[in-house]
Amino acid sequence: MPDSRHLAAFFVAALLLAITPGPGIFYVLARSLAGGRREGTLSSLGTFCGGLFHVLAAALGLSAVLATSAIAFSVVKYAGAAYLIFLGIQMIRTRNTEPAALAGPDQRLAAIRRHPVLQGIWTEVLNPKTALFFLSFIPQFVVHARGHLFAQFVFLGATSVVLNTLADLAVVQFAGPLGRLFQKNAKFRSRQRAATGLGMIGLGLYVAASDSHS
């Protein structure tokens, strides 16, 4: 484990990055507004799992492929952007669909297939910039003299993911009640889901158009 000085510096830097608005926070915010606190919390759990995937990938050296291969980076980036756009389109198409608890068996099955945890996982896994972030940020706080580099990397990476998730959950707490209010009114729900869908599409287009290694 890194020494206390490195840990303190890492914690401050990771906390500042966690509370800085970015695609992850905006994604969780959109899901919270669309489905209330429960959907936002489950989406946060999904992005948490996706973040841990990137931590392990970076620790094992797999993420280095994205850093060295422009083709691999572009493929993952555009796949992630396409997935966000797909979610946005689906949200617009189903803006007038009943909540799963009131829907029939077929609609419940469809809702399960669109589970926010799985969507959160894929949204984070298909974000190559998360991989590059861990490759560039975490190594600055790894102390080679202390050895156990893999364990240090995983510990620091997991800590960063936890801080990001706590920031996401804070967003859920504020946005969730507003989302539940929308869910109680069919007209508001329809309009809000349409607006959220457009926001997801916009986020996907932003990811696709952004500079690859910024």
State the predicted function of each range:
Residues 74, 87-130, 177-198, 210-214:
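Alpha-helical multi-pass membrane helix bundles of inner-membrane/thylakoid proteins
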Residues 2-74, 136-156, 160-161, 172-179:
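Juxtamembrane transmembrane-helix termini in multi-pass membrane transport proteins
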Residues 38-116, 174, 205:
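Membrane helix-loop-helix hairpins that form the core translocation module of multi-pass transporters
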Residues 15, 19, 52-53, 79, ...:
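Hydrophobic/aromatic residues within the transmembrane alpha-helices of Major Facilitator Superfamily
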Residues 87-91, 161-169:
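Transmembrane alpha-helical segments that form the membrane-embedded catalytic/substrate-channel core
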Residues 5-6, 206-214:
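Juxtamembrane boundary at the C-terminal end of a transmembrane helix
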Residues 56, 76-83, 129, 133, ...:
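Residue-level signal for the membrane-embedded core of alpha-helical transmembrane segments
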